[in-house]
Amino acid sequence: MKIKTNAENERLLSIVDVLRKEQKPFWRRVAELLAKPKRHRPEVNLRKIEKLAKEGDTIVVPGKVLGDGRLTKKVNVVAFNFSESAKKIMEEAGAKYMEIEEYYKKNKEAKDAIILT
């Protein structure tokens, strides 16, 4: 059975393909989580990031970041998708956010990054 492809699926498949080839266990784990069906991919609320992250941490969410809760810490959040409300709250808090592809290109070592599911 052929997988239905749309822009999001093509983007996802290309990211998973690149990350699976990476030798670092961190990126292989991210690829494994991204390869799951959408209904099984992590969805993390800002409330959870606020609770578990420290100031300046880099949090990687191999799924979607949702805007429930508030964020007071200046953290770097990396994810496959962000809700509009999450983007707005992070901007107001001074936190930075970027997509997984962009972060991977800038920081292949992923030192000090934390996977949050």
Where are these regions (language model features)?
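Extended polybasic, low-complexity segments that bind anionic RNA or targeting/receptor surfaces
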Residues: 1-117
